[in-house]
Amino acid sequence: MFKGKLMTVTLILMAVLALGIVGCGPAEEPTATVGDIVGIDPGAGIMAATEEALEVYDLEVGLIEGSDAAMTAELSTAIANEEWVIVTGWAPHWKFAEWDLKFLEDPELVYGGEEYIASVSRLDLVDDYPDVHEFLQNFYWDDAEIGAVMDMNAEEPEFLANAQTWIEDNRDLVDGWIPEGLEGDGETIEILMVEWDCATASTYVVSAILQEAGYEVEVTAVDAGVMWSSIAEGDADFFTTAWLPGTHEAYMDEFGDDVDEVGTNYEGAQIGLVVPAYVGFDSIAEINDYAD
């Protein structure tokens, strides 16, 4: 009888222990999810490419229109809360220095490969201001150089003052861009730009150099379509941020015969979908696995 009671107690203890093991075992971590892709202004080429990506990859998320500032604010909030988020992104951009980010792989090459950034002018700028045209041909910088200006602008949005400071710190490089005859006499140069951080950096550096040379400079921010059409119609002089051959391909197709692609000022640019490095997938093709 004692033996029988002992066996019963033993079985009860084993059952309790089994329940305890199950109850105290590590709970399965919930899978993080992603919501809609956070985009920028609807006229941007990257937004058209992202609309195409939604179709090509049959994505079960949407695309939110906004602005560069709204996109980076959303990214900042998500990272502060260690949340997963997908944004439209491009490099060069100061956010890559601020946070640990990664481009999602694009196996269908919707966003294309590497791009370059070019300065584009009205056709007769070379006749009216040949030295300004030559300066734009010479203007070229690398990731560290444009990144330094973008970092300054992100910390304190005094764009012209930051450009002037950067110029003083990089005088040898800048002097190599300036042709011997670059000397204005109060003539007005009109520069257009889109409100992208890389465009702000290059536009104000070029503007500051031309002001040093004696020109009056007017900078106007517009959307990409207006920027291209205005230069094609001769309503302004130039802009420094044509992303080619992909992002601004449609504009080049439409206006290419009526503008002058003066020269490349940056190589190795990239566009695509960007996530914090801690996000647990690496490809656009995997987004649906984590869509909420």
Predicted stretch roles:
Residues 52-53, 69-84, 204-212, 225-239:
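Short helices/loops that flank or line small-molecule/ion binding pockets
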Residues 69, 92-142, 263-272:
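Periplasmic-binding protein-like
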Residues 25-27:
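Bacterial signal peptide processing site
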Residues 30-39, 136, 185-198, 215-220, ...:
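Short, well-ordered beta-strand elements
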Residues 29-38, 122, 141, 257-292:
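A conserved helix-loop-strand patch within extracytoplasmic ligand-binding domains
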Residues 20-23:
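C-terminal motif of bacterial Sec signal peptides marking the signal peptidase cleavage site
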Residues 77-102, 240-255:
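A ligand-binding cleft/hinge motif common to bilobed small-molecule-binding domains
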Residues 63-74, 194-197, 218-230:
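Short helix-initiation/N-cap motifs at beta->coil->alpha
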